[in-house]
Amino acid sequence: MQVFTGTDKVKRGLAQMLKGGVIMDVTNAEQAEIAEEAGAVAVMALERVPADIRAEGGVARMADPKKIKEIMSAVSIPVMAKVRIGHFVEAQILEALGVDFIDESEVLTPADEKYHINKHAFKVPFVCGARDLGEALRRIAEGAAMIRTKGEAGTGNVVEAVRHMRQIMDEIRSLVLLPDEELVAKAKELGAPLDLIIETKKLGRLPVVNFAAGGIATPADAALMMHLGADGVFVGSGIFKSKNPRKRARAIVLAVTYYDDPYVLAEISEDLGEPMPGIDVRKLSESELLQVRGW
């Protein structure tokens, strides 16, 4: 029997299995266990949550393999880990460790300011960030099996995630209405392959799952992103930078499931303790923005 391990179809199918769920950033085995108990569909293993990366500065790299293995041993749900944009050797290391997904992430300090990783060269599926349809389709062309909005990680401010999700969804709606004879010009405008433009127009959505990420800190934030068309939610600093991580983690998982029921949302949002401190994105300089990394 022919086995199709590592094909685009298989990798996209693995990402589809996470649909409707919450993926949580964790920095140790204890946090990973809290995330799993709360109902997370996967965890993202990293050295520091985005809020700490933003506050401490310096160069942010792939997490220590020892830490990643400890997290993998602690939970039964899929484990993801981040690599720097363009750093294919970090990705090779993570694949050798046996992680379930690799996130080529703008949250870490880019290793290559010109090229992203050729993700087709790997058997493990990749997730990548995007601010608009062009970015999303370029990452998919490189082999990404999953897209997430970039938002502005580590701020606790959902405004950029909202902007990016609305932008992607608006562009898809416009593409669906575009006459076929204009698709080649649209592909040139977006810097994306024509076959992906045609597929997206036919589907009326991205060819891969599209999660929301970047600044999601409350159950209401998570529910909002689901209303805007997200297939699920990444939560970075919002859980473990809050006063009651265990309770907030569970509430955000429930919010993604019951995003269309304001009565349930009201109940699960009660008495969660202080959320993570937020940052006004408008006060960040261009050099402080993480979302501008990549192309």
Curated annotation (Swiss-Prot):
Binding site for D-ribose 5-phosphate: 25, 154, 215, 236-237
Record's keyword annotation contains Lyase: yes
GO biological processes: amino acid metabolic process; pyridoxal phosphate biosynthetic process; pyridoxine biosynthetic process
EC main group: lyase
E.C. designation(s): 4.3.3.6
Top-rank taxon, per record: Bacteria
Record's protein name: Pyridoxal 5'-phosphate synthase subunit PdxS
